[in-house]
């Protein structure tokens, strides 16, 4: 009986090892260009660009530059940098909610 149990356990072990759930493959880190990694939204400019505040290491949200006489483009920086251009439109959009 012991030989039968050992055969069953050996069979179960080999079956489990060969047909076990495969671990999820780790995502390969793809180096993104600086322009895409530091951008704050689609088509809203990038941190550090002219008219935007902050840098790639600073969470920020950039808005399109208006045609009015504004030195900034309506950008809000969080953490590390000073919060700038906190106007009503920026606050209403929820951009500065985490500041």
UniProtKB/Swiss-Prot annotation:
Chain intervals with Low complexity compositional bias: 83-99
Name of the protein in its database record: Cysteine-rich C-terminal protein 1
Q: Where is this region: Disordered?
A: 1-42, 65-99
| Pfam families reported in the protein's UniProt record | NICE-1
Instruction: Return the Pro residues bias intervals.
Output: 22-32
């Amino acid at each position: 009986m012991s030989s039968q149990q050992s055969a069953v356990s050996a069979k179960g072990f080999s079956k489990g090892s060969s047909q076990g759930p495969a671990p999820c493959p780790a995502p390969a880190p793809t180096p993104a260009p600086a322009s895409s990694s530091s951008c704050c939204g689609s088509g809203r400019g990038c941190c550090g660009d002219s008219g935007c505040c902050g840098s790639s290491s600073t969470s920020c949200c950039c808005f399109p530059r208006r045609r009015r006489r504004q030195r900034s483009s309506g950008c809000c920086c969080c953490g590390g940098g000073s919060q700038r251009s906190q106007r009503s439109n920026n606050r209403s959009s929820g951009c500065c909610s985490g500041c």
